[in-house]
C-alpha cells in the first residue's frame, strides 16, 4: 500500500486566526505611525537651523549644536528607553513618550525659538522623541512569529520617514504661517496619536515583563556579544544613512556644483529609496538569513562607496553609485534588526535595541 504524498489539510482558517492576524496588523500600523510622528518632532529643528542662524546671529558651531543636541539625546536615550520598554511594554511606552515629546515641541514653538539657550534646552528634551524607536522593535517583534519578524520590523522602520515629513513641510509651514505653525501642528498630531494609542494599543498575548531592575538588565545587556555585533552593523548601515542624509546636499554642491534645490531633491530621493528598502531588507532576512543579507549589503556599500570616492560623472555612474548606496544601507538597516529579534534573549530585545539604535544614531556623526 502506497502512502499518500498529499500533505495533511491544516484545516480552515478560523475566525480566531483572522482576529490574531488583524490584531498584528493594527498593532504594526499604530506603532509605525507613532514612530513617524515622534521622528517628525525629533527633526523639527534641523530645517530651521539656517533661519535661526540669521535671526539670532549664530555662528557655525552654534548652528550645528542646535541640530546636534536632539540627535545625540535621542540616540543615547534609546538605551534606557529600550530597557523600560522591556519592562512596561509598548502599550504604555508609546503614549507616554509621545505625550512627553509634546512638551518640548510646544515650548520651542511658542517661546523657545527666541534665544540660543532656549533652543538648546528645548532641543535637549526634544531628543526624547528620537528614543521611540527602541519602544517599537520589541513591541512589534513580540506580535509576529520569527519567520515574519524581519519584514514586520522593516515596515516599522519605515517610520524613520518622519524626518522626511519635517524636511518637506517645516519651512513651508513657517513661510505660510509663523515659526510656531509646524510645532503646533506636530503637537496636535502627537496628542491625537497618544489618545488613540492609549485606547487601541495592546501588548502581545503572553508577554512576561522581566523581573530584574532596569540597571541590572542594562548591565547584562552590555555584556552580550549580540549587543556589540549588532551595534557595529547598525553603526555602518543606519549611521551611513544618517551621514548621507545630512551631508549629501553639501557634497553634491561642492563636488558637482549643483544648485541647492537640485541637491536637496537628490537627497530626498536618496532618503526615500533607503526608507523603502528597509522592509525589503527585513523580508530578505526572513527569506534567506540575516547574516547573508548583511554581508551582501555591506559588500554593495563598499563597492559603491569606492566608485563614488573617485568622483565620477554624476550621470550615469555617480547617480547609480548613490542609488546602490541608498538601497544597500536601507536594506542593511532592516536586516540588522531582523537579526536582533532572533539573537537577543527574550525579555532583552528592547534593551539590545536601545544600544544598537544608539550606535546607529551616533554612527552618523563619524564623518
Predicted regions and their residues:
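A late C-terminal transmembrane helix in Major Facilitator Superfamily
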Residues: 346-367
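Conserved MFS/SLC helix-loop-helix module at the cytosolic interface between two early adjacent transmembrane helices
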Residues: 76-114
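Helix-loop-helix hairpin linking two adjacent transmembrane segments in secondary transporters
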Residues: 155-201
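Juxtamembrane intracellular "pre-TM" segments in multi-pass secondary transporters
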Residues: 11-21, 204-231
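C-terminal transmembrane helical hairpin of 12-TM major facilitator-type secondary transporters
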Residues: 288-336
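Cytoplasmic helix-loop-helix junction between adjacent transmembrane helices
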Residues: 122-159
Amino acid at each position: 500500500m502506497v502512502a499518500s504524498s498529499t500533505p495533511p489539510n491544516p484545516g480552515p482558517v478560523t475566525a480566531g486566526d483572522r482576529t490574531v492576524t488583524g490584531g498584528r496588523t493594527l498593532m504594526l500600523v499604530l506603532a509605525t505611525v507613532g514612530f513617524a510622528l515622534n521622528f517628525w518632532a525629533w527633526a523639527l529643528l534641523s530645517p530651521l537651523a539656517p533661519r535661526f542662524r540669521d535671526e539670532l546671529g549664530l555662528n557655525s558651531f552654534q548652528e550645528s549644536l542646535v541640530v546636534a543636541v536632539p540627535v545625540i539625546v535621542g540616540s543615547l536615550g534609546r538605551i534606557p528607553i529600550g530597557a523600560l520598554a522591556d519592562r512596561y511594554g509598548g502599550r504604555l511606552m508609546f503614549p507616554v513618550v509621545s505625550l512627553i515629546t509634546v512638551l518640548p515641541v510646544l515650548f520651542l514653538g511658542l517661546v523657545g525659538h527666541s534665544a540660543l539657550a532656549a533652543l538648546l534646552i528645548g532641543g535637549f528634551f526634544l531628543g526624547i522623541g528620537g528614543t521611540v524607536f527602541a519602544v517599537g522593535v520589541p513591541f512589534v517583534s513580540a506580535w509576529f512569529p520569527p519567520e515574519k519578524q524581519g519584514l514586520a520590523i522593516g515596515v516599522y522602520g519605515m517610520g524613520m520617514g518622519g524626518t522626511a515629513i519635517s524636511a518637506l513641510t517645516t519651512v513651508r509651514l513657517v513661510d505660510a504661517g509663523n515659526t510656531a505653525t509646524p510645532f503646533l501642528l506636530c503637537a496636535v498630531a502627537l496628542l491625537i496619536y497618544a489618545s488613540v494609542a492609549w485606547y487601541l494599543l495592546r501588548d502581545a498575548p503572553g508577554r512576561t515583563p522581566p523581573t530584574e531592575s532596569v540597571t541590572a538588565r542594562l548591565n547584562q545587556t552590555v555584556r552580550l556579544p549580540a549587543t556589540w555585533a549588532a551595534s557595529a552593523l547598525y553603526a555602518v548601515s543606519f549611521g551611513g544613512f544618517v551621514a548621507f542624509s545630512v551631508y549629501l546636499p553639501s557634497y553634491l554642491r561642492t563636488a558637482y556644483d549643483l544648485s541647492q534645490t537640485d541637491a536637496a531633491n537628490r537627497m530626498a530621493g536618496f532618503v526615500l529609496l533607503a526608507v523603502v528598502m528597509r522592509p525589503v531588507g527585513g523580508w530578505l532576512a526572513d527569506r534567506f538569513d540575516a547574516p547573508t543579507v548583511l554581508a551582501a549589503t555591506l559588500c554593495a556599500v563598499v563597492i559603491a562607496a569606492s566608485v563614488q570616492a573617485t568622483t565620477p560623472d554624476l550621470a550615469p555612474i555617480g547617480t547609480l553609485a548613490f542609488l546602490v548606496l541608498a538601497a544597500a544601507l536601507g536594506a542593511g538597516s532592516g536586516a540588522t534588526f531582523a537579526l536582533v529579534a532572533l539573537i537577543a534573549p527574550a525579555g532583552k530585545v528592547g534593551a539590545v535595541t536601545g544600544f544598537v539604535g544608539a550606535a546607529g544614531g551616533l554612527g552618523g556623526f563619524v564623518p
